[in-house]
Regions:
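Short coil/turn segments that connect the beta-strands within blades of beta-propeller domains
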Residues: 104, 171-173, 215-217, 265-267, ...
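Non-catalytic accessory segments flanking enzyme active sites
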Residues: 56-167, 178, 257-318, 327, ...
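A flexible loop/linker signature enriched in serine peptidases of the S9 family
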Residues: 111-118, 155-160, 179-188, 203-205, ...
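Short loop/turn segments that connect beta-strands within beta-propeller blades
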Residues: 126, 193-197, 237-241, 285-289, ...
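Loop/turn-rich, solvent-exposed surfaces of beta-rich toroidal or solenoidal domains
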Residues: 312, 319-339, 397, 403-418
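A conserved hydrophobic secondary-structure block that centers on an alpha-helix together
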Residues: 146-210, 414
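N-terminal pre-domain segments of enzymes
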Residues: 4-6, 12-73, 81-95
Length: 567
């Protein structure tokens, strides 16, 4: 808070607290010297007393500040109300999300006019191969719809309410959820039956996060220290007192925070620990929840990495699966790289850099770029970069940074950044397995939304847009075949086809580019045959699409509604 005691009046004399208070009516925090010693240095903190939120002095001071704020803002009351009403008039309050399949249910969110919070809902899938989201109308319940969590009802009686995480068991019977009713970001987690609505007696109070094991027999959760740092992971057997819980990991280094979750394939419990520049991943098989967590790769100073797991189904010499570890790291490149490890031929302890390099970022213009390529640090960041390990679409990219990869049962999605814009590239899982086993660069194709091909007109309906796309898919097929490296996605425009020098035609230096954001999202199921992605720009509302990497069919699932227009 600004302290006016150091200000001088027109005469040059130092003004007192009282004179400043009298002139503007602003409350001024009193000074209560408290000595604190850090590393041998003494520091006098005159406002340490403000840390005690339960103190009557602190509460009185905050109340006085709030009154002062209302007093000073009173002349703007009408304008504030006008701005609020104008912004609210553009928001469609009665709305819902596109259903997302997880295990045996389609999950979605409803929002209702006049309600402060969303309502979490679900409906059962129709069959194991049901991958088309059900058609659900705004405000109209669908057969079999179940309310999973009505935040409006849960928030009643609380001045503040926030959900701090929600994990539903694989069989859909149990929900582990956390709530914060004070605003201090410490959450109380409970276990609720989704069949009866009743809750188990155990409550995990004041924690940072939690997850089930796949069988919902165990809960792992993160404890917070006095500085709100997540520092320890606890193990709890469902149905037993929390006093019997066991600490399974304790982070001694105060620079590091800790998190717990399940790997994408749900075969491992994952502890992620990291500081601002260093990360480490520890794993424990979900088949042995009482076992010991072990580091996948021991932490190295100033090295960030993450690991996920997948497999190439039936791609082995005798039709067996090939288990994979997919490592994303910056140990050898400041703009990150992705390595895929065949876990049949590599054994722990693993090291960063082993396996097949699938995508490598540019070292140009980076602080440690010289360690990758001599002279790279002094080169402009937009210098075209090529690497023999990279897919053809990345060769010659400007300012290339690798942002991640996800390997599902039917497709592989690569996310990267070039020319300061985010990009997505996709390929089928079968094609990725062939390239991996052959030791050649993977043949990704960039996904370019149709919005980049047209005049950004958004007056058409979803059905009209999809009908127009259907008319051009056949032509794009022929174009893809004519381009040589042509397992192109139907949703990809002519601009995205790889040119002879490896650059994309819409990314040439000196051209005017539309600014947009695109990203993979809403794909929690490993088995889903289609990939969802989002797209938005400064002049176009957010859109959610899905695309079939095998056929290239691109569907617009939802576009955000902006009431009253936005031109």
């Amino acid at each position: 808070m600004t302290d006016f005691r150091g200000e001088q009046g027109a005469t040059g004399a130092r003004e007192s607290d009282e004179s400043v208070q009298d002139k503007c009516g602003m409350p001024i925090a009193k000074r209560v010297p408290k000595e604190r010693v850090f590393h041998g240095d003494t520091f006098i903190d005159e406002y340490e007393w403000l840390r005690d939120k339960e103190s009557h002095d602190v509460q009185d001071y905050v109340a006085a500040q709030n009154r002062y704020c209302e007093q000073r803002m009173e002349p703007l009351k009408t304008l504030r109300s006008t701005l609020f009403d104008e912004l609210k008039s553009h928001v469609q309050e009665n709305d819902m999300s596109v259903p997302t399949r997880m295990d045996g249910y389609w999950y979605f969110v409803r929002t209702q006019e006049g309600q402060q919070y969303a309502v979490q809902c679900r409906v059962p899938i129709r069959s194991a191969d049901d991958w088309d989201p059900p058609t659900i109308e705004i405000g109209v319940p669908i057969d079999g719809e179940q309310v999973v969590f009505d935040t409006n009802a849960e928030a009643q009686g609380h001045d503040f309410f926030r959900i701090g995480g929600m994990h539903i068991s694989k069989d859909g019977r149990w929900m582990l959820y956390g709530t914060d009713t004070s605003g201090d970001e410490r959450y109380d987690f409970r276990i609720r039956s989704l069949e009866t609505g009743k809750e188990l007696p155990e409550v995990f109070k004041g924690i940072g996060g939690a997850c089930f094991t796949p069988d919902a027999q165990w809960v792992f959760y993160v404890k917070l220290d006095d500085a709100w740092r997540p520092y320890a992971v606890m193990r709890h057997r469902v149905g037993t007192p929390v006093t019997d819980d066991v600490e399974v990991y304790h982070e001694q280094d105060e620079r590091f925070w800790v998190g717990i979750g399940l790997s994408f394939d749900e075969r491992n419990l994952v502890i992620g620990t990291g500081s601002k520049t260093t990360t480490e991943v520890l794993l424990l098989s979900t088949d042995d929840p009482e076992g010991e967590f072990r580091a996948f790769i021991p932490r190295e100073p100033d090295v960030e990495y993450d690991v996920s797991f997948s497999c190439f189904e039936g791609a082995g010499e005798h039709g067996e699966d090939i288990p994979l570890a997919v490592v994303y790291h910056n140990a050898l490149n400041p703009n990150f790289e992705i390595d895929v490890i065949d876990m049949r031929s590599h054994e722990p302890p693993y090291r960063l850099g082993e396996g097949v390099r699938v995508a490598v970022g540019s070292p140009y213009g980076c602080e440690y770029g010289d360690e990758v390529e001599p002279g790279a640090s002094g080169m402009p960041i937009g210098t075209p970069y090529s690497n023999p390990c990279n897919p053809a679409i990345l060769q010659g990219a400007h300012g290339l940074g690798i942002e991640g990869i996800s390997i599902h049962r039917h497709y592989v999605a690569l996310q990267y950044r070039a020319e300061s814009l985010t990009h997505i590239a996709v390929m089928t899982k079968d094609a990725a397995a062939e390239d991996f086993l052959a030791g050649r660069p993977w043949k990704f194709t960039e996904l370019v939304p149709h919005a980049l091909e047209d005049d950004w007109d958004v007056d058409e309906s979803v059905d009209e847009i999809n009908e127009e796309r259907a008319e051009v898919w056949g032509a794009l097929d022929q174009l893809a075949a004519a381009q040589g490296e042509g397992s192109a996605v139907h949703g990809v425009s002519r601009k995205a086809m790889t040119s002879s020098d490896g650059a994309t035609a819409d990314a040439m230096p000196g051209e005017t580019r539309r600014l947009y954001s695109i990203g993979v999202g809403g794909n929690p199921s490993y088995d889903a045959p289609r990939m969802r992605y989002s797209f938005s720009s400064y002049t176009r509302p957010g859109e959610l699409h899905d695309i079939d990497p095998a056929t290239g069919e691109d569907r617009l699932l939802k576009r955000a509604t902006v009431l009253g227009g936005f031109e």
